[in-house]
């Protein structure tokens, strides 16, 4: 049984979820604190006590959602790319799961729509995006695989960039950043073919 969550924390989570939904649906300008409070089932005063004002609420909700995506990705990478025997199988498992739990998650689709809409109003969103990018999380496990003689990657970060472009990037393009559904078969084809191309460049050839 997990740790109990305080009433205050439950209210904060409800406010954040309501704010993300309403900001994405109605835009920052048209979303009122009254509407967020009503959606969350709390008082307007409670919203202000947790987040200060609407702008601070908006930025914190975006930051927290970015962080949630990053934590999910890190957990997938750690679980699937530790103690690797079959590199291709492990990479396919990692990327497939990352797509299912991160790239195509409802939260990410909502976040992408929100950021693209509000970026002109809040240029700081680009900094939040860069500072919490998930791509660097692939560099360390690729370095470990290279050190173990399972990959030939002199520059693990560049290899991570290539792996992402061939798999996650292609899925993002096909699904318009997770806002348009694509089939599991399409996703599998992109992932498996992308990883095979990646291994043509970075795989260790066995004689």
Give the ranges of each region predicted by the language model.
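N-terminal intrinsically disordered/low-complexity leader segments
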Residues: 1-10, 73-74, 154, 206-207
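Helix-turn-helix
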Residues: 14, 18, 22-56, 60-63
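Short helix-capping/turn signature of helix-turn-helix
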Residues: 28, 51, 114-122, 133-134
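Short, basic, alpha-helical segments at the C-terminal edge of helix-turn-helix-like DNA-binding modules
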Residues: 63-69
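Hydrophobic alpha-helical connector segments
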Residues: 74-108, 112, 159-160
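Amphipathic alpha-helical segments used for helix-helix packing
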Residues: 102-127, 172-177
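Amphipathic alpha-helical packing segments from all-alpha helical-bundle domains
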Residues: 104, 110, 123-148, 157
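Hydrophobic/aromatic-rich alpha-helical bundle segments in the mid-to-C-terminal region
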Residues: 146-196, 206-207
């Amino acid at each position: 049984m997990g740790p109990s969550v305080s009433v205050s924390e439950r209210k904060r989570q409800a406010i954040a979820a309501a704010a993300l939904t309403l900001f994405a649906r109605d835009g920052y300008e048209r979303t009122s604190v009254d509407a967020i409070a009503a959606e969350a089932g709390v008082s307007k005063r409670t919203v202000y006590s947790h987040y200060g004002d609407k702008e601070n609420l908006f930025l914190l909700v975006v930051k927290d959602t970015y962080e949630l995506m990053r934590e999910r990705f890190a957990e997938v990478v750690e679980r699937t790319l530790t103690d690797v025997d079959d590199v291709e199988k492990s990479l396919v498992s990692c990327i497939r799961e990352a797509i299912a739990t991160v790239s195509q998650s409802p939260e990410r689709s909502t976040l992408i729509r929100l950021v693209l809409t509000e970026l002109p109003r809040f240029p700081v969103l680009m900094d939040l995006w860069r500072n919490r990018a998930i791509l660097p999380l692939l560099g360390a496990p690729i370095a470990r695989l290279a050190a173990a003689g399972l990959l030939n990657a002199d520059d693990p970060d560049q290899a991570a960039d290539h792996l992402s472009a061939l798999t996650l990037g292609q899925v993002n393009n096909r699904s318009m950043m997770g806002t348009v559904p694509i089939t599991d078969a399409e996703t599998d084809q992109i992932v498996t073919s992308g990883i095979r191309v990646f291994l043509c460049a970075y795989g260790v050839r066995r004689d």
